[in-house]
């Protein structure tokens, strides 16, 4: 079934560009490692692929059951972390795939649900956990000291006034609602109402990345993709934050034989050269003005893609040890 209708309500960022990078041939097996609302998966199915879709959010998996029914046996949903996609596939007897796609960060579906605690525009419990496991945003913000909070805001949100915001958060504790946190950040930054970009944007992003250990997950996911992509398989990664994009850029540069030194997210090069596991990456792709106007979230998106070679995957996870906050 290649005539599966496209649902514009679920169109993710850079959809056409991702599908072009994947160059899907009918019958190929592709992984949508961040299922979300199913936008990439739907397009992969429409191109004739068999799709294995993964998400750590149980609500996303539950919401995808209707699409499974439409897909005539070509869609499998897996609840799990994309950093473990190689293990999740192996448990199902799959050792190689033709393509893997990552859409890093929070989904529009999660932002639209105020009760999930991701949005500064909708009031809800200060949660931000994608899988409802571990420490919530409220738990962390109400126990962490000012310096730890400031470091997270600076490194994961590029918030230049992180110290000011952290002091305001500590002074306002306890915080339990997203509206409370958003108000504290706005007041700390003295940003006028109606400004083009909400001043709470960076802080909410940084806290979410920290709570869900998203950079660690990205590092693990890239290494897992290297292990399960067949020779000629395609990798496509859409990121929304400068640190995420740097991790992807340096991973592909190193794995394609380039020099990835100079980043705090990478270890020093080893003496023994390893065979390139990816061809030279395609040029990065950014959204056009029309997509940015249609979807403001697209403004910060970057797509990077590359094709797998026949070289064996590098041993271990050479980036994981370098990731820390």
UniProtKB/Swiss-Prot annotation:
Specifically methylates the N4 position of cytidine in position 1402 (C1402) of 16S rRNA. The keyword Cytoplasm applies. One of its GO terms (biological process) is rRNA base methylation. Its EC number is 2.1.1.199. It is found in: Cytoplasm. Keywords: Cytoplasm, Methyltransferase, rRNA processing, S-adenosyl-L-methionine, Transferase. It holds the Pfam family Methyltransf_5. GO terms for cellular component: cytoplasm. Residues 256-275, 281-307 are annotated as: Disordered. SUPFAM superfamilies: Putative methyltransferase TM0872, insert domain (SSF81799), S-adenosyl-L-methionine-dependent methyltransferases (SSF53335). The lineage of its organism: Bacteria, Pseudomonadati, Pseudomonadota, Alphaproteobacteria, Sphingomonadales. It catalyses: cytidine(1402) in 16S rRNA + S-adenosyl-L-methionine = N(4)-methylcytidine(1402) in 16S rRNA + S-adenosyl-L-homocysteine + H(+). It comes from Sphingopyxis alaskensis (strain DSM 13593 / LMG 18877 / RB2256) (Sphingomonas alaskensis). S-adenosyl-L-methionine binds at residues 38-40, 55, 82, 103, 110. This is Ribosomal RNA small subunit methyltransferase H. It comes from the Bacteria. NCBIfam families: 16S rRNA (cytosine(1402)-N(4))-methyltransferase RsmH. Its main location: cytoplasm. Belongs to the methyltransferase superfamily. RsmH family. GO terms for molecular function: rRNA (cytosine-N4-)-methyltransferase activity.
